[in-house]
Design a protein with these regions (language model features):
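Gly/Pro/Ser/Thr-rich low-complexity, intrinsically disordered segments predominantly at protein N-termini
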Residues: 1-158
Length: 158
């Protein structure tokens, strides 16, 4: 299945799950809790308030070598949007991709997503756990603080 088919299929609209495609085009569903949604909203608000030369977005679809993955939140510089605008899915990752861990996520799955986003051009990946604690990653591995958002909190209060 292709991402455009997922978007056009009426049976796949308004599901209470996040949809991604694996490398074989199979649909992968991930249920999200209200806590997940609240963390997503708080992070997106922080991104909008703290960087003026780009845009924040949620549910950001990115084509990767392992299928279409959907970052819970993302931020792209103006240059990213000048190149890609609203292409769906993006063929390159925005500057920052953020995953919010759900109980159904395995550690290996999150590690794979970090690597996939970075290999598609993300400069940073943030991983937020269910309690709001954030870890920051670049292609060099885990870093102490965000380089893109130096004032990023290490914990999202909700």
């Amino acid at each position: 299945m292709k991402w455009s088919q997922v978007l056009e299929d009426p049976a796949l609209q308004n599901l209470p799950y996040k949809i991604e495609l694996n490398e074989w085009g199979n649909i992968v569903l991930s249920p999200a809790s209200n806590k997940h949604g609240l963390l997503q909203a708080e992070i997106s608000w922080f991104l909008r308030q703290n960087k003026k030369n780009g845009k924040a977005l949620t549910e950001c679809s990115i084509n990767t070598s392992k299928g279409v993955k959907v970052a819970d939140a993302a931020w792209g510089a103006d240059d990213f949007f000048n190149r890609n605008y609203l292409e769906t899915p993006y063929q390159e990752a925005p500057d920052l991709c953020i995953e919010i861990i759900s109980p159904s996520n395995a550690a290996q799955e999150i590690e794979e997503k970090i690597n996939l986003y970075l290999s598609q051009g993300a400069r940073e990946v943030w991983v937020c756990d269910e309690e709001g604690f954030i870890k920051f990653y670049t292609s060099q591995g885990e870093i102490e603080a965000s380089q893109l958002f130096p004032n990023a909190p290490k914990k999202i209060e909700y």
